[in-house]
A protein has these predicted regions:
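Cytoplasmic helix-loop-helix junction between adjacent transmembrane helices
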Residues: 117-155
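Short amphipathic helix-loop junctions that connect adjacent transmembrane helices
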Residues: 43-56, 246-266
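Intracellular juxtamembrane helix-capping segments at the cytosolic ends
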Residues: 44, 127-141, 330-344
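Hydrophobic core of transmembrane alpha-helices in multi-pass small-molecule transporters
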Residues: 31, 113-128, 316-330
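C-terminal membrane-cytosol helix-exit motif in multi-pass small-molecule transporters
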Residues: 168-169, 188-209
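Juxtamembrane intracellular "pre-TM" segments in multi-pass secondary transporters
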Residues: 2-20, 202-231
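Helix-to-loop junctions at the C-terminal end of transmembrane segments
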Residues: 73-86, 276-290, 374
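C-terminal ends and interior cores of transmembrane alpha-helices
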Residues: 95-110, 300-312
Length: 387
């Protein structure tokens, strides 16, 4: 049992210069990744709609394929990093994502819906590794700095709130008559940049003892009450957010006839809501407890749905999606922090990999359902489904 003096010493442990550098490097990578992902959420759905014409049942398939790729890549990428270390894992997967973005661009030029989706799938594989930025920053950080480190890395995603959608507007017509083809060139550049910048992280690899230690069975770890709360909160928070966010461009542009700039504005502020709270979510967790922050996040997501059901004007979409983003941040950051408490270093890969597999499998299902529910039943029923 840890002695009181040791506990007091742990509480006073200050983040080292290495910890701060890891936060900075991974925050930049998170910002670039979220710029690319925000770009994809906006452009891929509209690209799907352009390719499919009036039949919008499968307009969200590109987003679904990205999320299927992310779900499929969660466990392999976690084990890749266990084997080669965080740095090598991030570099390798960024190259896969870059190839995927280039393939998507080429498929657009050839008007190949299947090829476009395959490229998006490869980008999703990279996304599985990029989701590990939040875990990686906590690997070597002192316990009292973990929540803040995680929230600061997630906060950097606020860059994507504006860079992603603005990049879509600037690049959607640069390659001539094929709308959005140039956007996926930008996606390739964002993705490649993360693989270069991440070289600057300094996270120790597992020791020989940690690597050979298989730890407890996965089922035993995930059946702990803390682990159950962590996985459920992260999964539901992401599924609800993704269901509504994926359908929003269709609802605004196709259903309600709002202009592209209004849709971009709503998505930008949704992303601000998702990531800007990260500058203080860690402090809120340390002050009010992680469970209270998760509960507040769930309440905000419910409020978001209520506002969306009231009306479909631009202000309704704006406030609803903004609250949806804040709610997601509280729930997801809280779930991530809880998950770091249930495993040892040797158990890290399988626990984090399975957690993200569950989360992104749920997201993929929600994404596919979003287009189908919207096509047959409309925007209000998408919101009822979120409830």
């Amino acid at each position: 049992m840890q002695q009181p003096s040791e506990c007091f010493k742990a509480e006073l442990t200050m983040p080292s210069s290495r910890d701060k550098r890891n936060v900075l490097v991974l925050a930049i990578c998170q910002g670039l990744f979220n710029s690319g992902r925000g770009l994809t959420f906006l452009a891929a759905t509209l690209t799907g709609a352009n390719m499919l014409g009036d039949d919008l049942r499968f307009a969200t398939v590109p987003i679904t394929m990205m999320l299927v790729g992310t779900a499929a890549g969660t466990i392999p990428s976690a084990h890749l990093m266990r084997w080669l270390g965080r740095k090598a894992g991030f570099i390798i997967t960024s190259l896969i994502g870059t190839v995927g973005a280039i393939l998507s661009m080429y498929a657009l030029l050839e008007n190949s819906f299947i090829g476009f989706n395959f490229g998006i799938f490869l980008f999703g594989l990279y996304g599985a590794a990029a989701q590990q930025y939040r875990f990686a920053v906590a690997d070597a950080a002192p316990d009292n700095f973990k929540a803040k480190a995680i929230s600061l890395v997630l906060a950097a995603g606020v860059l994507g709130a504006f860079i992603g959608p603005e990049t879509v507007e600037l690049t959607k017509d640069v390659l001539g008559s094929t709308e959005f083809a140039g956007t996926f060139v930008a996606l390739a550049l964002f993705t490649l940049a993360t693989g270069i910048i991440v070289i600057g992280i300094d996270i120790p690899r597992l020791t020989r003892e940690e690597y050979t230690d298989k730890g407890r069975p996965l089922g035993e770890i995930l059946l702990q009450p803390v682990a159950i709360v962590a996985v459920i909160s992260a999964t539901l928070g992401y599924v609800i957010m993704n269901l509504l966010m994926t359908a929003t461009p269709l609802a605004m542009l196709v259903g309600e006839g709002h202009v592209f700039n209004d849709t971009k504005f709503v998505i930008e502020w949704h992303a601000v809501g998702m990531f800007a709270p990260g500058f203080f979510t860690g402090s809120l967790i340390n002050r009010f407890s992680v469970l209270n922050v998760i509960i507040v996040g769930a309440i905000l997501q419910a409020a978001s749905v209520a506002i969306a059901l009231i009306g479909s004007s631009v202000p309704h979409f704006w406030v609803s999606l903004f609250l949806l983003g804040i709610g997601w941040n509280f729930v997801f950051t809280g779930g991530t922090k809880l998950l770091t408490e249930v495993h040892t270093p040797s158990e890290r890969a399988k626990v984090q990999g399975m957690n993200d597999f569950i989360v992104f499998t749920g997201m993929a299902i929600a994404s596919l359902c979003a287009g189908t529910v919207y096509h047959f039943l409309g925007w209000q029923w998408v919101n009822f489904a979120a409830l």
